[in-house]
């Protein structure tokens, strides 16, 4: 029994020392009047593509704000976009994803609103296109946007079209 306890102590020490150290990297000032930047149903507010990390949030003025940094860097490049979000409704979260070609895709400000979607003008860029439709169908009443990356780099975009209890799940594929 004594040896079993010693073995467990050594194993737990080995596992605890093998864990990666976490590091906090400040980004920028953001809206903090409610949970819109941190709601539990928010999907992909921080994504990594190769050695570049991207982040999206609403700043204190309610502007959709994007950032990127190299993984080991502590300084973020921050861009305030021309797009606004209703920061007073925590449903209006932002979702981002980078596709297999390095383009950043962004969806924001949805709580029964028309689809707000744009993507970067070039790979790894923080500059966005104007608002774009995806398919043009079922894009007038969107809530809960979520991007998912497929193993081949293509994207799946999900959202609810319609009201609570009377909506449909919409799934778009981006290739």
Residues of each region from the PLM?
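Extracellular, repeat-based ectodomains that mediate carbohydrate processing or recognition
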Residues: 21-175
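Bacterial Sec-dependent N-terminal signal peptides
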Residues: 1-22
């Amino acid at each position: 029994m004594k040896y079993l306890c010693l073995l467990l102590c050594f194993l737990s020490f080995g596992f605890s020392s093998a864990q990666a150290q976490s590091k906090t990297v400040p980004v920028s000032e953001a809206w903090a009047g409610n949970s819109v930047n941190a709601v539990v149903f928010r999907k992909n507010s921080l994504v990594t593509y190769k050695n570049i990390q991207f982040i999206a949030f609403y700043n204190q003025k309610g502007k959709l704000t994007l950032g990127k940094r190299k993984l080991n860097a502590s300084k973020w490049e921050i861009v305030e976009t021309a797009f606004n979000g209703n920061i007073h409704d925590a449903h209006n979260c932002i979702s981002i994803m980078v596709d297999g070609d390095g383009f950043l895709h962004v969806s924001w400000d949805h709580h029964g609103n028309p689809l707000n979607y744009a993507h970067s003008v070039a790979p790894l860029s923080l500059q966005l296109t104007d608002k774009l439709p995806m398919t043009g169908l079922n894009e007038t009443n969107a809530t809960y946007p979520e991007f998912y990356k497929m193993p081949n780099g293509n994207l799946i975009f999900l959202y609810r079209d319609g009201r609570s209890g009377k909506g449909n799940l919409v799934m778009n594929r981006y290739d």
